Design a protein with these regions (language model features):
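Sec-dependent N-terminal signal peptides
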Residues: 25-33
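Hydrophobic face of amphipathic alpha-helices that form TPR/SEL1-like repeat modules
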Residues: 45-46, 62, 73-80, 109-116, ...
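Short helix-capping/linker turns of helical repeat alpha-solenoids
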Residues: 50-51, 64-67, 80-82, 87, ...
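Terminal, low-structured helical/coil segments at or just beyond the last alpha-helical repeat
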Residues: 177-211
Length: 211
C-alpha cells in the first residue's frame, strides 16, 4: 500500500519537468516573435522616415530568416529600385517567396501584375490563379478581384453565379460596401434562374471555398 504514493510521486516528477520545459519553450518562441515584430517595425520606421538603405538592409535580413512581411516589402524595393539598385529578377524572386509563404498582399499583387502585364507578359490565367489563392487564404481583395475575373470571363470561363458569390464573400470578409453594392447591382441584372443559382453558390462557397 505504501508503494502507490511513492510510485505516483516518481511519475509526477518527469511530468513537472516536461511542463517546465514546455513553458520555457513557449517563452522562447514568444520572445523570438516579439523580437521579430520589433525588428520589422524598425525596418518600417526606417522606410517611412526616408532611410531607404537602412530599411532595405533590415528587410533583407528579416527576409532571409523567413519573415513574409519583410519578403514582400523587400520585393517592392527591388522592383522599384528603392534603397538598392533596381533588380526585377530579385524583386520577383522575393515576391513569389512571400506569396508561397502565405502573404496575401503578395498574392494579390502578383495577380494584378499578371492581369495588366506589369514587368512581365500579361497572363490572365495566372492572374486568376493568384487571385484565387489569395481568396482562399481569406483576402477580401483577392475575393473581389477573383469575382471580377469570373464575371467578365477573363482568364477563366465566365461564370456569373460564381462571380457574384465571390463578390458577396469579399463584402463579408472585408466589410467592403463597394463590393456589396457591386454584388447587388450585378445580381439585379441576372435572370431569376441565375439569381437563385447565385444565392446557392454563396452558400456552397461559404461551406467549401474550393467548391
Amino acid at each position: 500500500m505504501q508503494q502507490h504514493p511513492k510510485h505516483r510521486l516518481r511519475s509526477d516528477k518527469p511530468v513537472d519537468s516536461r511542463l517546465n520545459n514546455m513553458r520555457i519553450f513557449l517563452i522562447l518562441v514568444f520572445s523570438l516573435f516579439v523580437v521579430a515584430c520589433s525588428d520589422y517595425q524598425r525596418a518600417r520606421s526606417a522606410y517611412e522616415g526616408g532611410d531607404y538603405q537602412k530599411a532595405f538592409e533590415l528587410f533583407k535580413k528579416l527576409s532571409e530568416s523567413g519573415d513574409t512581411r519583410a519578403e514582400y516589402d523587400l520585393s517592392k524595393m527591388y522592383l522599384q529600385g528603392i534603397g538598392t539598385k533596381q533588380d526585377v529578377g530579385q524583386g520577383w524572386l522575393w515576391m513569389i517567396k512571400a506569396a508561397d509563404h502565405g502573404n496575401t498582399m503578395a498574392m494579390v499583387e502578383l495577380g494584378g501584375r499578371y492581369e495588366y502585364g506589369v514587368n512581365l507578359e500579361r497572363d490572365e490565367t495566372q492572374a486568376v490563379f493568384w487571385f484565387k489563392k489569395a481568396a482562399l487564404a481569406g483576402s477580401s481583395v483577392g475575393s473581389y478581384n477573383l469575382a471580377k475575373m469570373y464575371m467578365d470571363g477573363r482568364g477563366v470561363k465566365q461564370d456569373p453565379a460564381r462571380g457574384y458569390a465571390w463578390m458577396v464573400i469579399s463584402a463579408q470578409k472585408g466589410g467592403n460596401p463597394i463590393a456589396k453594392a457591386e454584388a447587388d447591382a450585378y445580381k439585379a441584372k441576372l435572370s431569376p434562374e441565375l439569381q437563385a443559382k447565385s444565392d446557392q453558390m454563396v452558400k456552397q462557397l461559404e461551406a467549401d471555398p474550393n467548391f
